[in-house]
Amino acid sequence: MRTLWIMAVLLVGVDGSLVQLWKMIFQETGKEAAKNYGLYGCNCGVGRRGKPKDATDSCCYVHKCCYKKVTGCNPKMDSYSYSWKNKAIVCGENNPPCLKQVCECDKAVAICLRENLGTYNKKYTIYPKPFCKKADTC
């Protein structure tokens, strides 16, 4: 019950590219992003960092590194345009350069999560942060 309350708090007031990211993840994996990846492993979700537990968690680690390279906008809050065409994510051509980067980061993690669905391990779905070992920097 406490976990559901925490997830609800995390979702309040969320807009911008996080919502777009969650939509991309659902489109690519068929999984609800917040529920399945919000606290997955050591790297999926806000404020989580550590040595990846598996390939799924590695997708999130690489995504965080991708966001660190973005300058000029807020990757978690600023909205961008994209479309879903023929079961593929297409980042909008009219996005400013910074938001093109954010969209490409989000697209890459969504595809990575789909490609690694076979490594998804339910024991890491709500993984305790204290069990995460320090990871290398990006």
Swiss-Prot record:
Domain of life: Eukaryota
Listed EC numbers: 3.1.1.4
BP term (GO), one: negative regulation of T cell proliferation
One Pfam family in the UniProt entry: Phospholip_A2_1
EC category name: hydrolase
Main location group: secreted
The keyword Metal-binding belongs to this UniProt entry's keyword annotation: yes
Signal peptide, first to last residue: 1-16
Swiss-Prot/TrEMBL cofactor(s): Ca(2+)
Ligand binding (Ca(2+)): 45, 47
Subcellular location: Secreted
Reactions the enzyme catalyzes: a 1,2-diacyl-sn-glycero-3-phosphocholine + H2O = a 1-acyl-sn-glycero-3-phosphocholine + a fatty acid + H(+)
GO cellular component: extracellular region
Record GO terms (molecular function): calcium ion binding; calcium-dependent phospholipase A2 activity; phospholipid binding; toxin activity
Keywords, alphabetical: Blood coagulation cascade inhibiting toxin, Disulfide bond, Hemostasis impairing toxin, Hydrolase, Metal-binding, Myotoxin, Secreted, Signal, Toxin
Tissue specificity comment: Expressed by the venom gland.
UniProt key word Kinase: no
Disulfide partners: 42-132, 44-60, 59-112, 65-138, 66-105, 73-98, 91-103
Family affiliation: Belongs to the phospholipase A2 family. Group II subfamily. K49 sub-subfamily.
Biological role: Snake venom phospholipase A2 (PLA2) that has low phospholipase A2 activity. Shows anticoagulant activities, strong myolytic activity, infiltration of polymorphonuclear cells, and edema in stromal tissues. Induces cell death of Jurkat cells in a concentration dependent manner. PLA2 catalyzes the calcium-dependent hydrolysis of the 2-acyl groups in 3-sn-phosphoglycerides.
Note: Is expressed in Amami-Oshima P.flavoviridis venom, but is missing in Tokunoshima P.flavoviridis venom.
Name assigned to this protein: Basic phospholipase A2 BP-III
Organism: Protobothrops flavoviridis (Habu)
